[in-house]
């Protein structure tokens, strides 16, 4: 039984694609409703005001406004602060 595989044979050469996780919209950026703010595994960031959480823990905006990162009860949270429209 050979301990070396034949020529041009290898057991390596596989790798999984990256998951593209992380913060997609940073503090102060203006977002529209439905825009993804954070892609994450688990709840590193928790949803705050005007932010929803998807089945895979993705945080998304439920209303238009400005992204704001903060903390509440020792947890990192993400809020959307509505942008004041100038009265015409």
Swiss-Prot record:
User: InterPro entries, from UniProt?
Assistant: Ribosomal_bL27 (IPR001684), Ribosomal_bL27_CS (IPR018261)
UniProt cross-references to PANTHER family, sorted A to Z: LARGE RIBOSOMAL SUBUNIT PROTEIN BL27M, RIBOSOMAL PROTEIN L27
Q: Which GO terms describe its cellular component?
A: cytosolic large ribosomal subunit
Alphabetical list of NCBIfam families matching this protein: L27
Identify the taxonomic lineage of the organism of origin.
Answer: Bacteria, Bacillati, Actinomycetota, Actinomycetes, Mycobacteriales
**Region Disordered, residue ranges:** 1-21
Family as reported in the entry's similarity comment = Belongs to the bacterial ribosomal protein bL27 family.
Name this protein carries in UniProt? Large ribosomal subunit protein bL27
**GO process terms (BP):** translation
Q: Which gene encodes it?
A: rpmA
Keyword annotations for this protein, in alphabetical order, are: Ribonucleoprotein, Ribosomal protein
Q: Which Gene3D superfamilies match?
A: 2.40.50.100
Named from the GO MF annotations, one term is: structural constituent of ribosome
Superkingdom is Bacteria
**Keyword Cytoplasm found:** no
């Amino acid at each position: 039984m050979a301990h070396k595989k034949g020529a041009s044979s290898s057991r390596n050469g596989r790798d999984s694609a990256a998951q593209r996780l992380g913060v997609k919209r940073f503090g102060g950026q203006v977002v529209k409703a439905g825009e993804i703010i954070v892609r994450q595994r688990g709840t590193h960031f928790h949803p705050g005001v005007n932010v929803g959480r998807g089945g895979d823990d993705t945080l998304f905006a439920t209303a238009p406004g400005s992204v704001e990162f903060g903390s509440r009860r020792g947890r990192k949270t993400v809020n959307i602060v509505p942008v004041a429209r100038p009265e015409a």
